[in-house]
Amino acid sequence: MNIIVVGLSHKTAAVEIREKVAFSPTQMEKPLHALVSIPDITEGVIVSTCNRVEIYATTRDIAGGIARLKRFLADYHNFPLETLEPHLYSYHGEAATRHVFRVASSLDSMVVGEPQILGQIKTSYGYAAEYKSSGIILNRFLHKAFSVAKRVRTETKIASSAVSVAFAAVELAKKIFGDLSDKTVMLIGAGEMCELAAKHFINTGVRGVMVTNRTFERAVKLAEEFDGKAVNYEDLFDQLHKADIILSSTGAPHFIIKPKDIEDVIRRRKLKPMFFIDIAVPRDIDPKVNDIENIYLYTVDDLNGVVATNLEQRKKESEKAEAIVEQEIGQFFKWLSSLEVTPTIVALRSKFDEIRRAELAKTMANWKDLPPEGEKRLEALTNAIMNKLLHQPTSVLKRSDQGNRNDLYVDALRNLFDLETAPHEEMELGELEE
């Protein structure tokens, strides 16, 4: 069985493309069921964040499986595959494992070392477990990814100087305004990103924080944490003129802020500048808002310049983290190989022993005067011949350094000898790695 990955990220696609194929985090049951209904896709997990959309799956047909996942991603969102495909990447086998381990360890993030991606993958895995689209292989695979991320976090300093996208937004605000002590921040949304942004803005010393959310209780809860003010979502545009910096991160499927809304707001501010940071995918703010005088709009892609300065200081720690990833890849593949190999060896030996016993019984039936000692010797002889015949193929199968060749050997033996292997028991999900 092969692990395959198909996806796109901030490295391969602009936000205008990523938002077209994003999955709603609150509506994962339907796409997950559709995913594992694809022919020859046996398990599947969907990861959808502001910076990436990825599908992890298992299949016996690597090329066909990858092609089907690409088609699924395009068709599910009614997006032309020919437009989407140039932005997609795909991996299988060791490369797929390396990619996911690196993503979970935040080595592939826009901001290397940021902790949010691990939580996002855990949430995605939780949905797959809940809706039963993951099985023994992806369960073990993602638990391994979580443990790799934990090793990276505890054995390197990659996260000690890391900044999140939310912190990068604060740094960008400081570049625009300089001193933020007389600035008021409006957070639209009450999720993790907004909470992180609130912490960073408070630490920077802003004058105040306002929070609005479609669920007012969540806005109140977040505002109370930072001695801020909760605003009813219906009153957003009545209160927006009081904010100098607006950070938006909702799960809305459409623009919630449009040019006509802001034209009235900026007039009430007597054209005092406003700084909008849209880190939602799909985007919350119509890009045409940026055409309005004294309005400055930035998206997640614009944060690249802010975070680039952190790359060099993390380079050494990243190298340590990459070494950990490589160690763990070998361990995981040893397990994955044994998952296919052990039942095949058992079935092969059982098949040979069945034939040996049948032929030995025929011989015994026709050899009426064979003494008991002779029977024992024939039993030992046929056992020895069987073991000699099976020694070489068994030894080759047990080697853990063969990569995808093991799959070829396993499939060949199963087909040549018509082997039936016992199904594996499901791995207990247990607790996710902290």
From Swiss-Prot:
The protein's site described by Important for activity is found at: H99
GO MF annotation terms: glutamyl-tRNA reductase activity; NADP binding
NADP as UniProt keyword: yes
Q: Provide the active-site residues from the annotation.
A: C50 (nucleophile)
- Annotated InterPro entries: 4pyrrol_synth_GluRdtase (IPR000343), 4pyrrol_synth_GluRdtase_dimer (IPR015896), 4pyrrol_synth_GluRdtase_N (IPR015895), GluRdtase_CS (IPR018214), GluRdtase_dimer_dom_sf (IPR036453), GluRdtase_N_sf (IPR036343), NAD(P)-bd_dom_sf (IPR036291), Shikm_DH/Glu-tRNA_Rdtase (IPR006151)
| Biological processes per GO annotation | protoporphyrinogen IX biosynthetic process from glutamate
Which key words tag this protein in UniProt?
Answer: NADP, Oxidoreductase, Porphyrin biosynthesis
What is the E.C. number?
A: 1.2.1.70
Q: Tell me which CDD domains the record gives.
A: NAD_bind_Glutamyl_tRNA_reduct
Q: In which pathway is this protein known to take part?
A: Porphyrin-containing compound metabolism; protoporphyrin-IX biosynthesis; 5-aminolevulinate from L-glutamyl-tRNA(Glu): step 1/2
Q: Where does substrate bind?
A: T49, C50, N51, R52, S109, E114, P115, Q116, Q120
Look up the domain of life of the source: Bacteria
Q: Which reaction does it catalyse?
A: (S)-4-amino-5-oxopentanoate + tRNA(Glu) + NADP(+) = L-glutamyl-tRNA(Glu) + NADPH + H(+)
- Sites binding NADP(+) sit at G189, A190, G191, E192, M193, C194
Q: Return the SUPFAM superfamilies for the record.
A: Glutamyl tRNA-reductase catalytic, N-terminal domain (SSF69742), Glutamyl tRNA-reductase dimerization domain (SSF69075), NAD(P)-binding Rossmann-fold domains (SSF51735)
NADP as UniProt keyword: yes
Enzyme class name: oxidoreductase
| Subunit annotation | Homodimer.
Task: Fill in the misc note.
Answer: During catalysis, the active site Cys acts as a nucleophile attacking the alpha-carbonyl group of tRNA-bound glutamate with the formation of a thioester intermediate between enzyme and glutamate, and the concomitant release of tRNA(Glu). The thioester intermediate is finally reduced by direct hydride transfer from NADPH, to form the product GSA.
Record family assignment? Belongs to the glutamyl-tRNA reductase family.
Recorded domain comment:
Possesses an unusual extended V-shaped dimeric structure with each monomer consisting of three distinct domains arranged along a curved 'spinal' alpha-helix. The N-terminal catalytic domain specifically recognizes the glutamate moiety of the substrate. The second domain is the NADPH-binding domain, and the third C-terminal domain is responsible for dimerization.
- NCBIfam families, per the entry: hemA (TIGR01035), PRK00045.1-3 (NF000744)
Query: What's the stated role of this polypeptide?
Result: Catalyzes the NADPH-dependent reduction of glutamyl-tRNA(Glu) to glutamate 1-semialdehyde (GSA).
Instruction: Fetch the HAMAP family from UniProt.
Output: Glu_tRNA_reductase
The protein in question is named: Glutamyl-tRNA reductase
Q: What is the organism field in this record?
A: Geotalea daltonii (strain DSM 22248 / JCM 15807 / FRC-32)
